[in-house]
Each structure stands twice: as structure tokens, then as C-alpha cells.
Regions:
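Short acidic, S/G/P-rich loop/turn micro-motifs used as interaction or catalytic elements
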Residues: 36-40, 85-88, 119-120, 310-312, ...
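Feature activates predominantly on carbohydrate-active enzymes
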Residues: 44-47, 51, 94-370, 381, ...
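Substrate-binding groove of N-acetylhexosamine-processing glycoside hydrolases
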Residues: 165-166, 178-179, 356-671
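Short, internal active-site loops enriched in acidic
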Residues: 68, 308-313, 394-401
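Extracellular/periplasmic catalytic domains that process cell-envelope and extracellular macromolecules
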Residues: 23-25, 71-74, 104-107, 296-298, ...
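Acidic, contiguous N-terminal accessory segments
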Residues: 2-3, 9-99, 168-176
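Structural motif
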Residues: 33-37, 80-85, 114-117, 192, ...
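Structural recognition of the beta-strand scaffold that forms the well-ordered cores
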Residues: 30-32, 78-81, 112-114, 189-190, ...
Length: 671
């Protein structure tokens, strides 16, 4: 527990126990680092000083441990970071700690922040997707302290999004705890399309670095790597000619690819024992040189059975015998009538949409796929007992099995959250599927594509997706892997913050998290809440029937061309009400400088959305009535949008590269 005294408040007496961090607006302690700090320890010290210097004192120092004795003018308090000698002398060891775990211990006038650290730069060590792989437990300890004791919140990337309370005095009670990841893996995939769409490459670089730091502060990290992708993308090239029996039998008796198919989409004949033998042989060859590991998720202890990116297709008698009986097999165009789709049409033709199962009269292939998982696992156990297998809940095997029971050594990557819209019925169906998989005995990794919606428009999904996340966390979730962080901070901020905050605090309610966000707007908090409540109502008003009309007119909508549906989602009257509410928020901010800056950030996002929709409207008018006048109007709308982005990109309101890519490829802009 911390006793924090806000500016202007003086207590009658201070408690005897504990340690002063800030006293009368001055640093009451010094930050101590090892003589030769690891990059993670240096990063942790820098992050701690950065935040403390904004919490009420500006004179916190970082001092190497060996020179402490010669610095007589330093404050008496000590905050030891990482592997200091004083930490070892205090009997604190990280040897048995989990990866990405940190210890916090305060006793007397000493505070120890230490964790399981590995060599390598923290931010530079994150991979292309923004994945934090190198353990930095000391950094985790620092963030845990800043969040829980100092009540610091990171609403969005950059200084403006840092909500840091200011104290005249701050005293920390004696405490000891360990901060550990809530999941064995957590990932919110970073979108990184380079500098296209940015006017200034330096702004692009700063934006990406700020997002990486935000991901770290929200503690997205890989204690274990549970992200197994499509596992058989090379099989057609390897075995298509020599072992065609490894692959799906199509309704016409051929084994192989769908019309227009490519090698990486070839689907397997999962009941074939020869295929099982090949999979195990490949696994043994790939892991033979690896030493034994106690981790259940080490590569040598895991077999990846995640099928390629297509629905299950095999019509051979053995695979069909593995299916649970369903009347829909006889009536379905593919299974009952032999209609073979093209590769491009494979998902809707087999009754699924971008990985999420549907109820369009298509049978579920989950019993077949789960028997595949169990059969290979049983064969692997004969070689090495206790093997873990990874599979998908995807496409036409997204629903839980009807008959097969599994075990906790089967890990299912669950893709089954709806893409859009997030109607109550769709979310209820997704929860039913999740609970069904858990009841079948598996553990799950949440792997949705749901956060790819919205382009730069004010889509609001914090409540519906946030509540489903909390349910998953309580019911068998051991990892997450979200696609993706699209970076639309000024229009989708509450939703992005909610999904980030839940990563480190899934115990918090969505309402509590949203209150954290709104409270940061000071006197404008209620008005900002009203503003986003409006967008929540607009977002939740989209019904399946309305969406089907939209897609019936525009064709299939995915994240690649979601903007094309923007005017149907956000009609003029909705945008006008949003403009009225943001003006009210600006007025409510009054003379509060920080509140005004933050509301202005949101207002810039709304202007950005308005200009984007104006360009879309001009394009749709041109498509309906091609003419020189309409062509000029569209060009002028695009230029106005371009000029706004050039002026606003340094403010970090949006990932301009993400928008440029899908406006160009999905909507035909910027040619």
C-alpha cells in the first residue's frame, strides 16, 4: 500500500513505517543500477525516473551502485534496480522466477525492483509484430509499481496519453509481492507497413516507437510462445507428387488443390496413418538437436497440427467416418452435391467467413479435426509421453466437437470471435463455442481478427469484446494473439485502451477501465463519456440484417476494404451528433490545459474521420455517375484529406501507413 499525498494536502502526522519516495516536492530517494546493467535494467531505470520526474519531483537521479559511497549529497532512500549487490545481500534471487516476472520488496528505506532479465535491448528486441520475447522482469516490476502504487495509466502512445498523478508527498508502505504475466503468452500484433502514407518518415518512426513502448507498458509479452501458425504450408511442394494420399480428396475423386489453389492452401487427409507418421518424423527431425526442456511448451514437446488456411475439405470414406452425423452433409452443395468452389470462394462456400464459423446450413468438421489431434498425440506419446498438440478452432471446424472429448494437452487457437458486426447474438454464439471447447477438455489461445475493423472511423467495441475477453480469461484461456493494433488512437481510443488494459488486469471490469480513460479528461470526463457512448450506440445499432444489405450492395467486406462500408455505418446524422458532442467536450474542458489538449486530440480524430467519409462519398458519387465534375470533386476530397494528414501525422492520431495501404488496395485510392 502507498500513502500518497496530493499537492496542497498536508497530513497531521505521517506513519512511521514505510519509505518516502517524494517529500515536499523533492526526490527522497535515488535510483540505483548495477555496475554493468543489462539493457533491461537500464530501460527499467529510465522508465522509472521518467515517470517519477513527472509525479511531483523533477530531480530523481540514476546512480551506478559502485559510486554510491562517494556521492554524499544524495537522498537517503534507495531504489535498487535489477542485479545490484545490495539486492543479492538482501537474499533476493531471480533464479526460480518465471520469465517476465518481477519482484517488488520494500523494507526500511530500500525498495528493490528486480526480475528475470535476459540480454538484449527491450524496444529494439521486439520483432516485426511488436512481440516482446526477451524476458525483462525488472521492467515488469517497475510497471507494476507505477500502475498500482502511483496510479499511472497509459491511455495511448506518447506523452499526451500518459495519465500521471502529481504528488507533493508520496510514502510507500512496506510491501513484498511478485508481478507475473496473467497469460503464458499475450500479443497484440503491430501493423507495420513501412513509410508509405506518411509525409515525414521521422513521424512514422516516432509513431512506431511510441506504440512499441505502449505495448510494453501494457505488458504484452511471450513467457511461452503459443503462436503456432499454419503448419503444413510446404507439404504440397514436398509431397504433392510423391504422396498425393496425404491431401484432401475432392468430390470429383481428385486429391489436391481447389481451382485456383496455391501450395500453401493445400488441405490434408487428416485420417491417413501415413500422414501421421510423416508429421511425427518431421517433428523428430526438427527437434533432434534441442536439449530436453521442462517447459511443456518448448518446441521439442509440442506438435503443431494447425491446418493450412482453408476449411476442411477431404471427402474420403475414412475422413467422413470421423465426422459426427449431421443432416446438413446431404444437403450441402459441396458435401452432398459435389460443387467444388474456387480457392477465392472457399470460406463462404464451406460455410464460414474469415475463420469464424457460421450457421448457413454447413456441417461442422470439428469431430474429424479433433480425432486427428488425439490420434497424432497418442502416437507421439508412444515415442515421448506427455506431448502437447496445437490445433485451430477455425473455418468449418470452429464449433466445438459434438462427440469427441479431448484433454488439456490439446491447445486450441480460437479464431471464432465475429469479425463484424459485433451483435449480441454473434457474441453469444462465440461464447457458446468457447465454452463448448473448454467443456471438451482443452485449453485455449484467443486468436481473433476482430480488432481489424473500423478503418479510422469511430467504431466502439470496448464493452462487447472486453466482456468476452474477461469471460475467456476465466474459462481456460492461457494465451492471446490479437490481429491487430491498427493504431487509430483518436477515434477508437477507449476500445484500444480497454483491450490493452485487460492484458495486465483482466480482473478489472470493462466499466472500471473505461472510467480510467474518461477520468483522464478532468473536467471534460462526463462529456467525453457522452461522446463515446454515442459511438457505442451507433456501433451496436448495426444488425445482421442491415449488414447483409450493405454487403449485398458492396460485395464481401473484410478488413482490407472495410472503409467501403463506412457511410453505411456512420451516416451524416451520426457524424453531426458526434461533432456536437465533441464541441461540448471542448467547452467542458474549459481552462484545464491537459484536458483541452486531450479533447483536441479526439477532435482531430473526428475531423480525420469526417474528411475520410467525404472522400468516400465523392468516390461513390463518381462511381454512380462518372463525369469530369465528379472526378474533380473526388480528387479535391482526396487532396483535402492528404493535406490534413500531413498536418496531423506528428500528433499520433492514427497509423497513416495502415490507412494508406487499405485505401489503396481495398478502395482504389491514391493511384
Amino acid at each position: 500500500m502507498a500513502i500518497a499525498l496530493l499537492t496542497g494536502f498536508q497530513p497531521s502526522a505521517q506513519p512511521v513505517s514505510g519509505m518516502d519516495i517524494i517529500k515536499e516536492g523533492k526526490a527522497a530517494c535515488v535510483i540505483v543500477i548495477p555496475a554493468k546493467p543489462l539493457p533491461a535494467e537500464r530501460f527499467a531505470a529510465d522508465e522509472l525516473r521518467y515517470h517519477l520526474n513527472r509525479s511531483g519531483a523533477t530531480d530523481f537521479q540514476i546512480v551506478p551502485e559502485p559510486v554510491l559511497a562517494s556521492r554524499h549529497s544524495l537522498p537517503k532512500g534507495r531504489i535498487y534496480i535489477g542485479r545490484c549487490r545490495a539486492t543479492a545481500d538482501a537474499g533476493i534471487s531471480t533464479e526460480r522466477m518465471r520469465r517476465f516476472s518481477g519482484k517488488i520488496r520494500q523494507t526500511g528505506n530500500r525498495l528493490f525492483l528486480v526480475g528475470r532479465d535476459e540480454p538484449g535491448d527491450v524496444l529494439k528486441g521486439l520483432d516485426f509484430l511488436g512481440t516482446w520475447r526477451k524476458s525483462a522482469g525488472t521492467v515488469i516490476a517497475v510497471y507494476d509499481l507505477l500502475e498500482k502504487e502511483f496510479k499511472i495509466r497509459w491511455l495511448w502512445p506518447g506523452e499526451l496519453g500518459e495519465s500521471i498523478p502529481v504528488f507533493r508527498n508520496f510514502r510507500l508502505d512496506e510491501t513484498e509481492r511478485v508481478a507475473v504475466p496473467k497469460l503464458r503468452q499475450s500479443r497484440l500484433r503491430l501493423v507495420n507497413w513501412g513509410n508509405a502514407g506518411w509525409n515525414n518518415p521521422d513521424n512514422a518512426a516516432r509513431f512506431r516507437q511510441a506504440q512499441l513502448r505502449w505495448l510494453c507498458r501494457q505488458r504484452f509479452c511471450l513467457e511461452e510462445d503459443l503462436s503456432y501458425g499454419h503448419g503444413f504450408k510446404d507439404y504440397w511442394n514436398r509431397f504433392g507428387k510423391t504422396h498425393p494420399e496425404y491431401f484432401s480428396m475432392l468430390p470429383d475423386g481428385r486429391r489436391g488443390l481447389l481451382p485456383g489453389g496455391i501450395s500453401g492452401r493445400a488441405m490434408l487427409c487428416v485420417s491417413n496413418p501415413a500422414l501421421h507418421h510423416q508429421i511425427l518424423a518431421d517433428h523428430q527431425a526438427a527437434t533432434a538437436a534441442l536439449p530436453p526442456s521442462e517447459s511443456e511448451f518448448a518446441p521439442q514437446n509440442v506438435i503443431n497440427l494447425c491446418e493450412n488456411d482453408s476449411p476442411a475439405l477431404c471427402t474420403c470414406p475414412q475422413c467422413r467416418a470421423w465426422d459426427a452425423p449431421q443432416a446438413s452433409f446431404a444437403t450441402h452443395p459441396y458435401w452432398g452435391k459435389g460443387v467444388i468452389p474456387t480457392l477465392a470462394n472457399r470460406f463462404p462456400a464451406l460455410g464460414s467467413n474469415d475463420g469464424a464459423g457460421s450457421d448457413k446450413g454447413a456441417p461442422s468438421l470439428s469431430d474429424r479435426m479433433t480425432r486427428f489431434y488425439l490420434t497424432v498425440q497418442a502416437a507421439a506419446d508412444k515415442i515421448k509421453p506427455g506431448m502437447v498438440v496445437f490445433g485451430y478452432a477455425y473455418a468449418n471446424y470452429a464449433a466445438p466437437p459434438l462427440r469427441v472429448k479431448l484433454n488439456e494437452r490439446v491447445i486450441i487457437s480460437f479464431v471464432g470471435w465475429p469479425f463484424y458486426p459485433f451483435t449480441a447474438d454473434r457474441m453469444a454464439a462465440a461464447r457458446k463455442d468457447w465454452d463448448g471447447w473448454r467443456a471438451a477438455g482443452v485449453r485455449l489461445v484467443l486468436r481473433p481478427n476482430s480488432m481489424l475493423v473500423g478503418h479510422n472511423l469511430p467504431v466502439f467495441y470496448a464493452v462487447r469484446l472486453g466482456n468476452e475477453y474477461r469471460h475467456a480469461w476465466k474459462h481456460g484461456m492461457i494465451g492471446s494473439d490479437f490481429d491487430s493494433l491498427t493504431g487509430q488512437w483518436a477515434t477508437q481510443g477507449p476500445s484500444l485502451y480497454t483491450m490493452g488494459r485487460l492484458n495486465s488486469r483482466p480482473d478489472l471490469t470493462v466499466e472500471t477501465i473505461l472510467d480510467e480513460y474518461y477520468t483522464a479528461f478532468g473536467p471534460a470526463a462526463a462529456a467525453v463519456k457522452d461522446y463515446f457512448t454515442h459511438w457505442e450506440k451507433v456501433s451496436d445499432s448495426m444488425t445482421d440484417a442491415h449488414w447483409q444489405k450493405v454487403t449485398g450492395k458492396l460485395g464481401r467486406i473484410s478488413f482490407k476494404n472495410w472503409l467501403n462500408a463506412g457511410n453505411a455505418m456512420f451516416p451524416p446524422e451520426a457524424m453531426q451528433e458526434g461533432r456536437r458532442l465533441i464541441k461540448a467536450a471542448l467547452h467542458a474542458a474549459d481552462s484545464d490545459i491537459m484536458a483541452t489538449r486531450r479533447v483536441a486530440f479526439l477532435e482531430s480524430g473526428l475531423t480525420h474521420a469526417e474528411l475520410t467519409l467525404a472522400a468516400l462519398t465523392a468516390q461513390q458519387k463518381l462511381q454512380a455517375q462518372p463525369s469530369a465534375v465528379n472526378r474533380k470533386a473526388f480528387a479535391e476530397a482526396l487532396e483535402k484529406l492528404r493535406q490534413f494528414r500531413r498536418q496531423a501525422e506528428a500528433d499520433g492520431i492514427a497509423d497513416m501507413g495502415y490507412l494508406f495501404r487499405y485505401e489503396k488496395n481495398g478502395s482504389g485510392w491514391w493511384k
